[in-house]
Amino acid sequence: MQTQRLRIAIQKKGRLSKECQDLLKRCGVKFNMMGERLVVHSENMPIDLLLVRDDDIPGLIMDGVVDLGVIGENELEEVGLERAARNEPSDYKKLRRLDFGDCRLSIAIDKDATYNGPQDLQGKRIATTYPQLVKRYMDKQGVTFSTCMLNGSVEVAPRAGLADAICDLVSTGATLEANGLKEAAVILRSKAVLIQCTAELSAEKQALIDRLLTRMQGVIQAKESKYIMLHAPTDRLEQIKMLLPGAEDPTVLPLSQNNNRVAVHLVSTENLFWETMEQLKELGASSILVLPIEKMME
């Protein structure tokens, strides 16, 4: 089914849903998420959002049902391996990593057990929701094992006698600790990514995707940057500039009725820590302001 409206699949509920919606809104895409609708139409752009389960998104992209999707790399790679094993289409274009959805897929074992490496898992039973990723990792390590497939509450498997170890997503490790487990090995580090189907799109759709990518770059870069303003003595200007990690050279402006000091403005692409601000003050800087940036375009 061909449509001139850009179709974007996003997670209906879960850890990526809200941040994905926030990103699209900051990119200027207006939509109303009220109700339990599965398809939401943008109010100001030819864009439709499809709200689906996260594990459905890769297949929708790979089958060409939707144009774009936002998905965690862990789910994307798991589904891709699964489809490839069934000789189903598994191609996609990865447009960019996003600035949310950070997690890692890790093997965890009993907190009192000793772990010397993957060979310790030889012949063991591993509970996981990601059997394909675990198999890929174990095959590379030359380790044979058996899988206990679970779709939830993976961390209780060892205590219930279902498995010797688990492989699951970890953010802080608190859930592992609460269940008497410890992280033994990271097999994948994951973030949310924006992906595109491999089908040839109309010029209008591709132009809209390019616009969205430019806006996403601006939103993400703005989130990671700060606008810094300060007054600096002219005789220490070069020393002060060396302390400021800028995206470009700073703007230096004269101050009215003061020839010995200037105003310095710049966009910093790195965090300005308290220690740096204290160093700036020691060099004679004053009126130091660090401000958030809402949008950027280079």
Swiss-Prot record:
Pathway: Amino-acid biosynthesis; L-histidine biosynthesis; L-histidine from 5-phospho-alpha-D-ribose 1-diphosphate: step 1/9
Protein EC: 2.4.2.17
Source organism: Photobacterium profundum (strain SS9)
Cross-referenced Gene3D superfamilies: 3.30.70.120, Periplasmic binding protein-like II (3.40.190.10)
Record HAMAP family: HisG_Long
InterPro entries: ATP-PRT_HisG_long, ATP_PRibTrfase_cat, ATP_PRibTrfase_CS, ATP_PRibTrfase_HisG, HisG_C, N-reg_PII-like_a/b, N-reg_PII/ATP_PRibTrfase_C
A GO molecular function held by the record: ATP binding
Protein name: ATP phosphoribosyltransferase
